Amino acid sequence: MRAWAHGVQRHGSAMAGSARLRMTPRMAKQCAGKVGIRKGMQKMLEAKDISFAYSGGRVLYDGLSLQVAPGERVALCAPSGFGKTTLCRILAGYLKPTAGSVMVDGSPLPLRGMCPVQLIGQHPENMVDPRQTMDGMLAEAGDVSSELLSGLGIRPEWRRRHAHELSGGELQRFCIARALACAPRYLVADESTAMFDAVTQARVWRFLMRWCEENGTGLVFVSHSPELIGHVATRTIMLGAR
């Protein structure tokens, strides 16, 4: 994928020398205090002894544990049908595990959609209010800088549109922008760029890598692309591996 050849590094700064993408003071204040960090507690997103079973009795996980440190970019790899999307929803607080716990910087994970963990799903149409314009959706999230929007390739005229007036890729960029505007400590991305062409996918991932590096944001992501994983991940977890 030649699109990756420009500015992507597995380690270090993805765009050295460019303007820095720090959270604005309002964004940092928005995130602060959402989750208290106990003195002496190591900062991390931690799933401990997670088990999950469907109502019919099918067990998806039994005692799964993982940790993600601030600034890490962790790829989750597993065959189709293993339950990667379910795990992403558990990590972001959208699903409650049958057993076990998810902790964020030493405290229980808050309700879904709140800082400090934001989910970027693979179906953006399921994560927006169809009655809102994109400007309205972003205004609810927090500070949205022009650098954030331009970095994701969002055109100004798109902001006045509703979800049904945008393509899937355009809508997904707004979902990514909203997640970042919430000033999360951790991002969970479930095949969130699979709908993009190669050039757009590379651009979005360069931006996400740069954001995470400069803000110390931990990233958990799912992808079936070995090349993308090789360029983005600082660590890979093979789910189901013994």
For every predicted segment, state its role.
Residues 162-166, 170:
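Conserved ABC ATPase signature
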Residues 45, 60-63:
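Conserved structural motif at the start of ABC-family nucleotide-binding domains
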Residues 176:
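Hydrophobic anchor residue at the start of the ABC signature
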Residues 123, 130-145:
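Q-loop/switch helix immediately C-terminal to the Walker
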Residues 77-79:
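The feature captures the beta-strand-to-loop junction immediately N-terminal to the Walker
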